[in-house]
Amino acid sequence: MNVKKTILAVLVFCSGFFNGYTFEISPEDSLNKNKGDTALTGFQYSRPGTGPFFYKQTLGNLGSAFRSVNFWDERKEFFNSGMNAFKMYEFSENLTPGPSPKERRGKTFSELKFINGSKKEQNFSIKHFQRVTNEISAGLDFGIAHSDGYYSNQVSNLRSFNVYASFQTKNERYNLFANYLSNKIVSQENGGLVSDTAFEITGSFDSKTAAVNFNDVKGLHKSKIFYAQQRFNFFSNRKKPVLTNDSLNISKEITKDSLNAADVSRNRFYLKHVFKYERRSSLFTADRFYSEFFEHAYYDTSKTNDSLFVRNFFNELSLNVENISVLKGKAAFYLAGNHQYFGFYQVDTVNPLSFIDTVMRNFSVRPGGSISWENGLGADIYFEKSFNDLKFDFYKAFGSFHWSVMKNRKKEAEEDEPGEKIFNVEMSLEKEMRNPDFIYSYYNSNHFIWFNQFNPIDFSKAEIKMERFGPVYSKGMFGRNKSFKISGAFYSVKDLTYFNEEALPQQFHERVNVIDANLHHFIKFRKFNLIYDLKYQHADKKEIVRLPVFSSYTSLFYDDNFFKRALYAQFGVDVRYCTWYFADAYMPATGQFYLQDEKEIGNYAYVDVFANFRIKTFRLFLKLEHLNAGFTERVYYTVPHYPMPGRTFKVGINWQFLNDVK
């Protein structure tokens, strides 16, 4: 008992060290003390891509290239560079910056995060939000990380920075949000192991002395983004409208901004302007020509110094009308027009003054709207037409229909409170014709040169989702107790672009069909919790699209309150798995993944054990990743020739401070 009291005293001291701050307990704790805090669920995910929808290809180290194995995983603009392998680590303007609406209630909010792991892996971040006046707010996010890597020549350093501010007039007629983001990733490339056999069968394998393909090869990836959004409301409407479901937030396209969607829904008629400037650069350097790895050295056989730059200007102006009574329902309509100026530049590896550049311009018009009724029925639709320098007929059309069953509101609830959703069905259709990423068309470097004129990609998608929600466990990452979600999608793509077995771009002119099905289940039985995710993917052209047939994530944990409910803790195990498939290989010189037929990977379970702890706003996790490393054959790859790390221990903390001012 004395030991327990000592542990509790230490944790309480840690969580209350700073004077002048009061801590905010989550609503579920204050309303129902015997319920666990779902904010703690998933806290042990220490890296991008290790969450419930985990399965991505990675070279194994923090800061190395990433690729999703979900077919058609990303939503892209009409013009996109294709430099996506490191975006997972970046701060992005598409994410709502700063604290959540709950956290904004206070005058100041701060958050500290720190993760420490084996091989000198350290990850530190800080977040601060300041409400200067009732009309002006500002904030700062900063993150820095370092890792030596589990294998030779894998050192990486990451730095991300985001500063933002918002302004709103007292009558709420005008508001402005702006932020500036800067990301920098320096990652050593080792080209993978020289011999997979030595890794897989050698009894006393030393990861740091194992032979790798590169000695001194690095990739430098930078991005700078300035984003601004302003909105002028023609009428002030301070009374909150009656909302019956989520469809009044217009379409997914419109609500992907940094302003709070609830604030947007209060306005009936407003004009919105979005501006974005983005500059990206990638630098690939090698100390010599690695002839055993690269087939060509077009410019210099002694070294490589390749640069690629992207500049993107984006402006959008939209007129929005919301909460209009139509057909006994509530409707929202908008008309948006945007202009994109896209520049793709490459520097000659020998003569830094020699540029190869491509500039494209695009103008798009997008009308859309949504409608919903009190019986839970709703629909969304939009159409976007592009006019560009390529003279291709680019467009995108989207339509969805959904039905939600809402639990009756309590008598004491506010009149405009929508109630609790317990069942939802959504069906959607999507059709798109767009340009392939620019990297497929133009590239000039020491090891790769190509100039292609590919056809537009013809993309179609049909999807159905069904969700069932059980009683509220707590509002967090995984929703509710006994929640169940199943979805199925059918993709059909003509003129799909990809990188072939020689790491060169190619276009497949036939139609590729893919079936994607997902199952999510969350069950809580007393103190035991089970989270299960299963994905099924099937492509009819397996020679072009390589996907694992099944991939799964399972988390089983026990949670309880200790020390008179002062400490909440979780103890559990995570398991990730996928079936055999010919996973894409990685080309460091271009930062792209390409087809390979030499090595089949998968059929291996990654097992992690963890313990999460929380006192007020102080959280701590202890985690042993890849517990089963070495128990069976060493076949743990997600990318050929790049084995995943072995057994590693990690510890992480998250500390939030809120100065609550009424």
Predicted regions and their residues:
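Positively charged n-region of N-terminal signal peptides that target proteins for export
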Residues: 1-5
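Sec-dependent N-terminal signal peptides
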Residues: 6-14
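Phosphate/oxyanion-binding loops and surfaces in catalytic or ligand/nucleic-acid-binding neighborhoods
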Residues: 13, 172, 580
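C-terminal segment of classical bacterial N-terminal signal peptides
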Residues: 14-21
